[in-house]
Structures are given as structure tokens and as C-alpha cells.
Amino acid sequence: MSLSIADQNKLDAFWSYCVKNRYFNIGYPESADFDYTMLERFLRFSINNCGDWGEYCNYLLNSFDFEKEVMEYFSGIFKIPFAESWGYVTNGGTESNMFGCYLGRELFPEGTLYYSKDTHYSVAKIVKLLRIKSQLVESQPDGEMDYDDLINKIRTSGERHPIIFANIGTTVRGAVDNIAEIQKRIAALGIPREDYYLHADAALSGMILPFVEDPQPFTFADGIDSIGVSGHKMIGSPIPCGIVVAKKANVDRISVEIDYISAHDKTISGSRNGHTPLMMWAAVRSHTDAEWHRRIGHSLNMAKYAVDRFKAAGIDALCHKNSITVVFPKPSEWVWKKHCLATSGNVAHLITTAHHLDSSRIDALIDDVIADLAQRAA
């Protein structure tokens, strides 16, 4: 392959742009401090993980052995015996959540999906794509699901097989829906546990809660049926990806044998990226639990620092327990555009992922927020 000088210059300019902005991100959940140079040699191969990593596939260039070890790792931290679980490395959180909702719908074809107003915007798309009945549930002011509204809507509709979409860290506020409370409330309606489905969206917090001293309930041991976590958020990856883990008994219900690849297909996508399982494998194999604890602890400390700085300046700021998402009043456009902040309604947030080794980016942002408030008050 060869490029014209103009095209090569365009690539070189983009390289310089990427180098300059590698660690810019403070407004979105993405860790930029990864190093997968040991995997660069594999980019010369078309690695395709079509089908089930646990079975033979007629496409030989796959990374199934590595994907299996990735799934074994996540089954462990999400507290389900590996032999009783199944999942795969997805294209990202949306596919992971779609897989969970798909399983719920296949188990309960007439069931209604309940999700809160603070749920990620992709779930509304999933509802349309799966053509699944749904009801939007109110959120509490801090972003957590309104359990009274959830139960009222289940009761009013007469739904006997609800499909619950629980947030383990909401997109904007980082709130964690209470898995134990949801199950207790549904049990009080007289609905047995085996008659409803509970999916957990842990895109960011799924790699935080396993490594803190007092995590909120979020695992299979706590009662979930499936869970999704992102690979590019807390772990870090040059290619967006995710991991979904579910109960094998439920997944077996959707398995289809495909003669074209001589394998069973259980996944949403057919051809699947074989490079991202290598990256997730390298990440989990190169970090001990102690190192994850240190990494998560540093991010949590940075979030606390941000909250303390905001409050010292008289600015209201919110950060949930075990969260690295700090919510504060939405500043003027020049501030949120300069710092590439995510905004929603009258709030904005910053996220202290692990590439923020010191407080410099946080300080620069908060200084601008303070200056903005002074300008508006003048």
C-alpha cells in the first residue's frame, strides 16, 4: 500500500493532533493511559471472532483462547461460576446492553422493559430495535431510580414478567440503582424471582466496584441475570469495546447453529473484532488486583479532590459513593466547549479516569468555572 504525499501529510498531521490531545479528556469516561505495543504485530492479521469462543470455528484466525480467558476473569469479578456463565467481548456498552435486553425478551416475550429516565440514551434505541414493550420510570433527583414509581408502574400494568434495566452508575450523575431494593419491592408484589429478568448496565462502574472496600450490590451473587461493562472506559483501549456476562442457561435458549462457519452463534454481531479480546486479555493479565485497587483508589481520590475544590469555592458539587463522576452546575458554553464537557439539562460533569495523574486538568477546569461565575455575577 502506498499513499500520495498529500495523503501522508494528512495522516502525519492527524498523528500530531492525537499526540497533542491524548490526555485531553475530562468530560467523558475514557482512560487514555493504556499501552498495547506488545500487540501491534497482530494488526497485520484479519482476526475475526465469529461465533462462540467455546467451540470450534472454521475461521482459523480467531483469538478465542484469549477471549475465553477474558470471560473467565470477568465471571470471577462478577461472582458467577465460569461454567455457569457465558458472554463475549462486544463492540461496546450498547451491544452489551442489547444482548442483556435480548435475553430478557427471549425469556419473557411479552414482558415489559422498565428503565429510568437517567438510563443511557442507547436503551431507547434498543427498545425500538428489539420491538420490546417498555415503560420509562422516574428518577430521583440524584439520578437513582425512583423505586416507588417502578413498582406503581408494574402494579398498574399488571405485568407478571418485568424486565428490569438497572444502572450501576448512571451516565450523567454516576448513580447506582439499588439491586437489593428492586428485588425486595418486586417480591412484595408477589412476583417470584424466576419470573422476571434483571440486567445491570455497569459500563464504567463495573471496573470500579470490584476493587473498593464497600461496593453497592451489583453482581450475580446479588441477584442480577446479566451485566455489561465497557473496555475502553476504566480499563482503556484504542478501540471501543465491551464485555457482557450472562447466565449460560439463559444464553443457550438463543443459540443457533450456523453451517457457514461450522459453529453455534449466540452473539448480536456476526463477524466480531478479534483484536479487542487480545487487548482486554493483555489488560487483565498485566494488572494484579492490588494494582487495580491502586488505580481505582487514585481515581476516587481525584474525584474527592474535585468535589472539595468546588465546595471550597461555594459551588455545589455531587459525587456518589464509589463514583468518579463529579456533577456540578452547567457553566457557560465557552467553558464546557473549551474543556469538552458532557452536559445535560442544567448540569455538567467531569470524570476522573486514571490518566489524570495529578490535579492539573481538574484545577484548570474549576478555575474557569469560578471565573465564569464571576463574569456572570458582574
From Swiss-Prot:
Keywords: Decarboxylase, Lyase, Pyridoxal phosphate
InterPro entries: Group_II_Decarboxylase, Hist_deCOase_bac, PyrdxlP-dep_de-COase, PyrdxlP-dep_Trfase, PyrdxlP-dep_Trfase_major, Pyridoxal-P_BS
Catalysed reactions, semicolon-separated: L-histidine + H(+) = histamine + CO2
Top-level lineage group: Bacteria
EC number: 4.1.1.22
Binding site for substrate: H120
Annotated positions of the N6-(pyridoxal phosphate)lysine modification: K233
SUPFAM superfamilies from the UniProt entry: PLP-dependent transferases
GO molecular function (one): histidine decarboxylase activity
Cofactor: pyridoxal 5'-phosphate
Cell membrane recorded as keyword: no
Gene Ontology biological process terms from the UniProt entry: carboxylic acid metabolic process
Subunit text: Homotetramer.
NCBIfam families listed in its UniProt record: PRK02769.1
Family affiliation: Belongs to the group II decarboxylase family.
Protein name: Histidine decarboxylase
